[in-house]
Amino acid sequence: MRKLRLVRIPRHLIIAASSWLSKIIIAGVQLVSVKFLLEILGEESYAVFTLLTGLLVWFSIADIGIGSSLQNYISELKADRKSYDAYIKAAVHILFASLIILSSTLFFLSDKLSSLYLTSFSDELKNNSGSYFFIASILFIFIGVGSVVYKILFAELLGWKANIINALSYLLGFLDVVAIHYLMPDSSITFALVALYAPVAILPIIYISFRYIYVLKAKVNFNTYKLLLSRSSGFLIFSSLSIIVLQTDYIVMSQKLSAADIIKYTVTMKIFGLMFFIYTAVLQALWPVCAELRVKMQWRKLHRIIFLNIIGGVFFIGLGTLFIYVLKDYIYSIIANGIDYNISGVVFVLLAVYFSIRVWCDTFAMLLQSMNQLKILWLIVPCQALIGGVTQWYFAEHYGIVGILYGLILSFSLTVFWGLPVYYMYKSKRLA
């Protein structure tokens, strides 16, 4: 009698599956909260809230690249069966210093930065913009620093823990928003920011504090700090340039679009972001797997995994776009009933193209980062940022939301779309 064999599911797929659930919860929270926040704040104040939440991505670099540097060291040391406690301890010291320096700097700069960023609103909102900007910045700095927890857990192939913490923090934030909607329906932008994002900032900090106690006895020397920082600088530069590329649309929106168009664009991007979050969850889980396969020189297996993920990602984006377009009236009515979401089919086609390009580009960017090969990114991403900024500014002036998407697609197509895969193949052949 033939024995039945249980199919062994790869660990990165188990982690990716938990990431999908986590990302769905997070994206769902962000979408559902739109309805409550619009009722609490009103259209113009919610547009300000939306632009402020765009700072979350900017302050993701509050970890100054230490998270990615630490993740790669953990993956490499795990492959060689060596301890990495000293690296975690050193990383916490560096991150604490980063938190203090950035928070102090923003205390003095918030008024000036907010006056440049939040220019298209009423005098009442602009008069309070400095405090809104500072509160948002502090919350997002804590979130950026705390994100190192997720890097550690993914490197240890315990990504499911990271996903639970992340999803739980956003669920708690959503419950806070619902509470102020019913208990304090006329709350300010500050209350809304703290309600939604304070749990997201606090939970990872609590976890990393306990983790620090666990590695407290590890011996750290100057070389440990030096090694972490030498790699982190590359990740910091790349992350900063990537953020400029991906967040230029928020800067352009703040200057070129009306409050109504800002809401249309950001809500639509949140809906599509739900799909893309699912793919980025796969990439996040694959990063340590790719790093270990590279150390073990298993290039054929690595290439096969990447090829299948790109094909699956593009197919998923296409299918998801069709689903959203068919049900768009129903979806938008649930998210924010009463807001005019008259969006042309061209926007949906452009979004499908844009996110398919992102699947391709982000996959190769992840591969190069897992190999610590960042020089090409330093060279090519500034060109992308320049092209993206100029084209989005110009096209948004003439075509509004469609113009921003034209600029995004052009910036990727003319630079990283071809540059990253060419460089990856060149480097992988040399290392093989």
From Swiss-Prot:
Metabolic or biological pathway: Bacterial outer membrane biogenesis; LPS O-antigen biosynthesis
Keyword Transcription recorded: no
Segments traversing the membrane: 14-34, 47-67, 90-110, 134-154, 164-184, 189-209, 234-254, 271-291, 305-325, 334-354, 376-396, 400-420
Membrane topology: Multi-pass membrane protein
Keywords noted in UniProt: Cell inner membrane, Cell membrane, Lipopolysaccharide biosynthesis, Membrane, Transmembrane, Transmembrane helix, Transport
Superkingdom per UniProt: Bacteria
Major localization listed first in the record, in broad terms: membrane
Subcellular location: Cell inner membrane
Annotated InterPro entries: Poly_Biosynth_Transport
A cellular component term, taken from the record's GO annotations: plasma membrane
Xref: CDD domains: MATE_like
GO biological process, one term: O antigen biosynthetic process
Function according to Swiss-Prot or TrEMBL: May be involved in the translocation process of the nascent O-polysaccharide molecules and/or its ligation to lipid A core units.
Name of the protein this chain belongs to: Putative O-antigen transporter
